[in-house]
Structures are given as structure tokens and as C-alpha cells.
Design a protein with these regions (language model features):
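Extended active-site and interfacial segments that coordinate phosphate-rich ligands
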Residues: 136-170, 194-268, 329-361, 405-412, ...
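Conserved alpha/beta-domain cores
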Residues: 107, 121, 126-136, 140-144, ...
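Acidic, glycine-rich flexible loop/linker segments
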Residues: 322, 336-338, 357-362, 366-389, ...
Length: 790
């Protein structure tokens, strides 16, 4: 017997041909994962058989295929005309008795005691949808807050018609699907009241790098369509799976989205408008739309789903404001990252620089350049020529035909999981989304470069810049004669860099985190109450979403450090405590009140001297608290501490005492405290310093300037800066031998070995334990060392 309607709990992934990917997946989760803690709202689906029989018995099938067989889909106006006619025919044709009876019976059961107040979502599920090689982002329609039987029947009709959207017709032709081989199933599902809570999308993989140890969650207030479409810039969270599995706090990143609008149920339904878009209260926009506990609960559900399907997943979720529960409303295989070749790495690097016109969230890691075309609406799509950069407010599936032609895409609105981002990834072109003002700051005809090669933030430059692309194979790296580690400053790039061959991080700098993720002088946060009014306002905006100014500083450090720690776990990550100079601290918000005006900051109030001074001690305590949380609370004990610029043995002792006072005792929980060996005094008295510290990491930049008496910020004598000078090498050799003799760690994290392969080889010959390199030189230097010393 062929069924017309099936309940979700009767369905599983083996039913894709009967009810399409979306409905089969909902059934799969309800049948298999309900007891494991995955909550999916109930519902039923019409079958592909019902759809095909409806078209056949009504005589529509022959009419439709007659039109499609002769259609040239690249003729935009002919496509629009054909699509419109076909959809109208379907909507005007009544359902046969049996199909309508079965839908009515199922609907009455689903409605239960709630009566006509109950609201439903009616979604399309195509039988060829979510084939792992095509993500069909939003190809068919969704109807929300549908109430009452009559409205449900109308919605099901529209869902059936949506199989013949212009974009769906064109997509099938371009992907090589036969129109007759695709059918449509309508899913009718109880609505989750996220209109009075929040909702969003999550991936069980990092969407940009393919890093598999995190769950990436986006969230905003109201119904989830806004996040999916990219109509809103959502909050973002990254959760580290191994830490979550260990029962520890596992959120390694939080980004507060601007969240200006939300979609809610409409009070006036007379025109069939079941939903409406309203502004979000500015105070709400400045808070996160999920609590930490909710973020972790979602990540747990995501992991259960991923384990069950045994592949990376793309999941839509919704929080019910009425019962406070978190529900999964859709799950499908993640289609882009999991297809990529993990064994080759492509690197894009800009060659020049230019003025920055605007910035937003970077999608992918590529660079694109061309002539800007700023489009106000889809009606202007014929303006786009192949190779142009598409600039617009936001995109939806109707834009797909022209997105294929663009060399890059720039939007005002949207987050990492919005429509523009998904399609850009699928097409392999760079996109910068959520810029806010791109359509104002860029004009049609401008020559621009869109760069996603610089981390989480994507930049649009005001001219066409040249760039290099290098491809390296990393599957068969030879044995290296020493540990090759990496220098990582920007947590935004950590997941990406972790794909390179490595033995951990020899230098994780706090400066980038303080400068870019925090941006405020720690003293200005500690003394927030006494700041001038306008400064208070500026700081309040920057710390939105965090419970206090002090907590903001600590939390942001925790996020930056734990992101790098998690990305490279279980390998060591050596975190250097802050090494800003007074002029750099001066430039942070509020910094002018606290920093001296030094003649030569390079040789002034920096490093260990700063930590032990009365003036800075309370700021250093914040850094210590952050390290403590990463190691002791989150359990990332692969994170170690490094102290920079220790001028005297006495100063070294004071820092170790200070760390212990702050709860960071050497040896406790395996904690090592490494010293930057970067002053001639460090090498000359290496033995005495090694009495105090657990090892050395050589800072060749400072060692060179202090040995040769150069200011490395001065351009006049820059040509004399050379870490391969014999005097510098003599000191480095002393330091390496001293550490070897004591059986203590010695590595190098200065620029030298990244710039000069022969210098790296010399260090290995001296017996150094590790060389820590800039990510862009890791593969080349590794191969050089293996070839020449292996």
C-alpha cells in the first residue's frame, strides 16, 4: 500500500526517497535519539508518492514537462515566465480526496487539545535535496506560524509549487538533476516558540577551517529564519568538544552580534502574513541571546547527532520561550568542508596594501579582486559581469544565478551561517558578510580587493591588489630533526593553522588578544568607576555582554588563550605573558592616563619589570587569573607560561614568587614556567636563570638588537640587523649549551629561523629542542631541515 502521509516517528534516513532529506532526518532523530537527549518537535510528512500522483492525476505533469523541456534556463525572463505559470497551475489545482483526507486526519491528531491556537511550520523537503554534493541552501519554501487546517492546506500547496521556483529549476539544470527525478514532500511540524526566545544554526565543525574539534553555534533573538537568511548579525560561540566531553566549561569563543531586528508571530494575520519583523530593544542587542549553560547544552545535542550520523552536521535549533527547552528543528550533513582535501593546504597572501573601505566577518581564506557592482535589489542582477565583486545588503536564494559570476561577495548583514556565506563556501569564492555599511562606503565601478586571508575579520581594500597563492601537500611530511612549532598571535587563525604539520605552539602572544579582542587598558577597566563620562560610555559599549569590566578583560583573555590551547591540544602551547611597551599600552582606550612618555620604550617599562612593579601588579593579576581558568577550570593543561624581558636574576625570582602568590606554582598540575632568553645578561648568566626557570625560549629579535646595540624600530640602521652575526651566535650557543647541560628545555621563537633556513639549521646543529616558526614558513622550513639534516 502506498501511503500519502507518514508520521516522523515512523521515518528514518532510509526514507529519503519517500519524504526527502529534511523530513527523513527529523524522523531519524525522533526514532533514534530522543532517549539520548535530542529534542525534536513532532509532526508528519506527505510522501513523494502523494506529490507525483497529484501531478499525474491532474494532468499537470505533462503540461509542466512540455514547458521545461524547451526552456533555456540562462534566459532570465523566459525562466521567470515559465516558473510563474507552473507555480500558479499547481496552486489552482485542488488535491484529490484521499490525499486531503489523510492530511486532515493527521493534522487533527497533531493539533490535539491545543485547538486553533496551535501554530505549525510547513517546510519543503525535496527528494534530491541535501545530497552530500549539493547543499541546496534554502531552495524551497518554509511557512511559519501557520494556524488551522485551511491555512495548512494552502501552505502545503505553496510548498509543492516551490519545487518550480526559478532558482530551483535553474539549479537542477546546472547540477545535472532530471526534473522528473525530483519530488517534494511537505513536513508539518509543531512550532517552537522561539519568537519569544532565540534560535539559530550550529555546525559540528569549524565552517572556515574544517577544524573538527569544535561545535560552532550562531544565535539571535526570535525565529531562526533571520539567522539562516543572514538578515541579522548573530552572536557566535565556539565549544571545544574534548573539553565538553571531560565535563569542563568548554566555550572557547564568544562574539556578541549586533542583532538589530527579529522575526516574531504577526498579530494581524488577515493578509496571510503569519510573521513580522520588528526592531530589538537596544539593551537586548547588547546581551548574549543564550546563556553559557544553553550553549553547552546545544553543543552536547550537536555531538550526539554527529556521532549518530558519523559525519559533520549542519543543524538548525530553536529555544521555546514558553517551556524554556532547546529543540532541534533540522539536521543535515555539512556539505562543504567535509568534501575538501585535508591533505593540501592553499595559502593566499596579499602582496601590497591599500586603504580599508570596510570590514566584516571573513568567509573562507581566499582573496578576490575586481570591479564593485553595488546592487540595491535582485532586479539589477543583469549589471553583474563575470569577475565583478557583488556588493549588496544581503542575499537570498534568488541571487544564486549571479553569485556564480562574482569574484567575491560583500554584504551589510549576515553571520557565518547565513545564505551568502553558505553559497560562497560552496562556490569557493571569498565573502565578507555583516559589514554594516558596505553599500554606503563602496560605489559601483570602484576597483576593490576582498581579503579573507587575514583571520576572522575580512577587509575590503580600495584598489585591486596583487596576491600570491601557494599550495602545499602535507600528508607525507618527512621526519624532522627537531620539533617544529608555530608562533600564533591571532586566535582567529588558530583552527586554520592547526591543520599545518606542527608540534605545538612555541609562542602564543597575548598582545594580539589585548589589542584586538579587548582594546582597553586594564587599569581603565579596574578603575572603571572613576573614568570620565565619555570614556565610560565608550568602554561600556566595548564590554557589552560581560558581567563587569574586570570580568570582560579576564574572559576575553581566557577565550583567546583557550582557543589556541584547544586548537593545538594535546601539544604544548607556550603563552607569553603580555609584552607591550608603554607606547603600545598608551594607545589602548584609556591608556593615556596610565602610561609614561618614554624616550625609548623598546628599552623601557616592559616585561618582567612591569609585572613586579607596584603600578602594574593588579593588571598582571588579571592575566594570571585567565591562565588559571584555562588550565585549572577548563583543564587545558597543555598551556604553559613564558616570561619576557627578564633583566636580572633577582627580577626572575620575584616573578616566580608573584606567580605563586596568584596561584600559579611551578610543577603544580605539571605547570612549566619558561623564560624568554633575549638579553645578553640571560645568556651570560644562563646557569643562574636556569636555577629559577624550567627552560629557555630564545627571542632572537631582542637578543640581536641588544648585542649589536641597535634600535630595531629605527629604519636608519635596519640594514645592520642580522641574527646570524657571530656575536649573537656566540651568546645563543652559550644559552643552548647551558640548557642542554642542565637537561632543561631550550627552543627559539624569534623571527630568525623563519627568515633564514640556514640559521634554523645552525640552531639544530647546536642541539636546540625546537624551532617555533611563522605559520607561512612551517612547511618549507620543515622540508629544508629534513632534507639537509634528516
Amino acid at each position: 500500500v502506498q501511503e500519502y502521509v507518514l508520521w516522523y516517528q515512523e521515518l528514518g534516513m532510509h526514507d529519503v526517497n519517500r519524504v526527502g532529506g529534511k523530513n527523513a532526518s527529523l524522523g531519524e532523530m525522533i526514532s533514534n535519539l530522543a532517549n539520548a537527549g535530542v529534542k525534536v518537535p513532532g509532526g508528519f510528512a506527505t510522501t513523494a508518492y502523494a506529490f507525483n500522483e497529484f501531478l499525474e492525476q491532474s494532468g499537470l505533469e505533462a503540461k509542466i514537462h512540455e514547458v521545461l523541456d524547451s526552456l533555456d534556463v540562462d534566459d532570465v525572463s523566459a525562466l521567470a515566465e515559465a516558473g510563474k505559470n507552473i507555480r500558479q497551475w499547481i496552486i489552482d489545482t485542488p488535491f484529490q480526496g484521499k490525499l486531503e483526507d489523510e492530511i486532515r486526519t493527521a493534522f487533527v491528531t497533531l493539533q490535539g487539545d491545543a485547538g486553533d491556537e496551535a501554530s505549525f511550520a510547513v517546510r519543503s523537503s525535496a527528494t534530491a535535496e541535501d545530497m552530500p554534493d549539493a547543499s541546496f541552501a534554502g531552495q524551497q519554501e518554509t511557512f511559519l506560524n501557520v494556524k488551522g487546517y485551511d491555512a495548512v492546506i494552502v501552505a502545503v500547496k505553496h510548498v509543492f509549487a516551490s519545487l518550480f521556483n526559478d532558482r530551483a529549476i535553474s539549479y537542477r539544470v546546472h547540477q545535472g538533476y532530471d526534473h522528473k527525478g525530483v519530488a517534494l514532500s511537505a513536513g508539518v511540524q509543531r512550532m517552537v516558540r522561539s519568537d519569544i526566545a532565540s534560535s539559530g544554526v550550529m555546525f559540528t565543525i569549524d565552517t572556515e577551517s574544517g577544524f573538527e574539534d569544535v561545535v560552532f553555534i550562531t544565535s539571535s533573538f526570535g525565529l531562526g529564519e533571520m539567522v539562516v537568511q543572514g538578515a541579522v548579525n548573530p552572536d557566535e560561540f565556539y565549544v571545544h568538544k574534548p573539553t565538553l566531553d571531560n565535563g569542563k566549561p568548554a566555550i572557547v569563543r564568544r562574539n556578541l552580534g549586533s542583532k538589530l531586528t527579529k522575526m516574531i508571530y504577526s498579530a494581524d494575520q488577515s493578509h496571510g502574513n503569519q510573521v513580522t519583523i520588528v526592531d530589538i530593544d537596544p539593551a537586548d542587542s547588547k546581551t548574549f541571546s543564550l546563556t553559557d549553560a544553553e550553549v553547552e547544552s546545544l553543543a552536547k545535542q550537536a555531538q550526539i547527532i554527529e556521532k549518530h550520523y558519523d559525519r559533520p552536521m549542519d543543524i538548525e535549533w530553536a529555544k521555546d520561550g514558553a517551556d524554556g527547552q532547546l529543540y532541534i528543528v533540522q539536521a543535515r550533513p555539512e556539505t562543504v568542508r567535509s568534501r575538501e582535501d585535508a591533505q593540501t593546504i592553499e595559502r593566499f597572501q596579499l602582496k601590497g596594501s591599500a586603504g580599508i573601505v570596510c570590514e566584516g566577518r571573513a568567509i573562507g581564506h581566499k582573496i578576490g579582486a575586481g570591479q564593485a557592482k553595488v546592487l540595491g535589489s535582485i532586479d539589477e542582477m543583469d549589471k553583474i559581469q563575470a569577475g565583478d565583486v557583488l556588493v549588496t545588503d544581503m542575499t537570498d536564494p534568488d541571487w544564486e544565478p549571479i553569485m556564480k559570476k562574482a569574484s567575491a561577495i560583500v554584504t551589510n548583514r549576515g553571520g557565518r551561517t547565513c545564505h551568502a556565506a553558505i553559497i560562497a563556501r560552496e562556490l569557493g569564492i571569498p565573502a565578507v558578510v555583516g559589514c554594516g555599511n558596505a553599500t554606503d562606503t563602496i560605489s559601483t565601478g570602484d576597483s576593490i580587493t576582498v581579503s579573507c586571508a587575514e583571520g576572522d575579520t575580512g577587509y575590503i581594500y580600495n584598489q585591486e591588489l596583487e596576491f600570491d597563492v601557494t599550495t602545499s601537500r602535507i600528508d607525507s611530511m618527512p621526519e624532522s630533526p627537531t620539533k617544529v612549532m608555530m608562533n600564533v598571535g591571532n586566535p582567529d587563525r588558530a583552527f586554520d593553522f592547526a591543520r599545518l604539520p606542527h608540534k605545538g605552539v612555541g609562542l602564543a602572544r597575548l598582545e594580539f588578544i589585548i589589542n584586538r579582542m579587548i582594546g582597553v587598558h586594564p587599569k581603565a577597566l579596574l578603575n572603571f568607576d572613576t573614568q570620565p563620562e565619555e570614556l565610560k560610555e565608550e568602554i561600556s559599549d566595548m564590554i557589552a555582554g560581560y558581567e563587569s569590566p574586570k570580568e570582560f578583560y579576564i574572559q576575553k583573555l581566557v577565550e583567546g588563550i583557550s582557543t589556541i590551547g584547544a586548537a593545538f591540544s594535546p601539544e604544548k602551547v607556550i603563552v607569553r605573558m603580555s609584552d607591550f611597551k608603554s607606547n603600545e599600552y598608551f594607545n589602548l582606550v584609556g591608556g593615556y592616563q596610565y602610561e609614561p612618555d618614554e624616550e625609548n620604550p623598546m628599552l623601557g617599562f616592559r616585561g618582567a619589570s612591569r609585572y613586579v612593579s607596584e603600578d602594574f601588579r593588579d593588571c598582571f593579576a588579571l592575566e594570571c587569573e585567565a591562565i588559571k581558568r584555562v588550565r585549572n577550570v577548563m583543564g587545558l593543561t597543555n598551556v604553559e607560561i613564558m616570561i619576557p624581558f627578564v633583566r636580572t636574576v633577582e627580577e626572575g625570582r620575584k616573578v616566580i614568587e608573584l606567580l605563586a602568590e596568584q596561584g600559579l606554582k611551578q610543577g603544580e598540575n605539571g605547570l612549566r614556567v619558561i623564560m624568554m632568553c633575549e638579553l645578553p645578561s640571560n645568556a651570560l648568566l644562563a646557569d643562574q636563570f636556569l636555577d629559577i626557570f624550567d627552560g629557555f625560549s630564545i627571542g632572537s629579535n631582542d637578543m640581536t638588537q641588544l648585542t649589536l646595540g641597535l634600535d630595531r624600530d629605527s629604519g636608519l640602521i635596519a640594514h645592520l640587523f642580522e641574527e646570524r652575526n657571530d656575536a649573537v651566535k656566540a651568546l645563543l650557543s652559550m644559552a643552548i649549551q647551558a640548557a642542554k647541560k642542565r637537561g632543561k628545555y631550550v627552543g627559539i621563537c624569534g623571527q630568525g629561523p623563519s627568515d633564514h633556513e640556514d640559521f634554523a639549521a645552525w640552531l639544530v646543529e647546536q642541539g636546540i629542542d625546537s624551532v617555533s616558526l611563522n605559520p607561512d614558513t612551517v612547511v618549507e622550513t620543515w622540508l629544508y631541515l629534513a632534507e639537509n639534516l634528516g
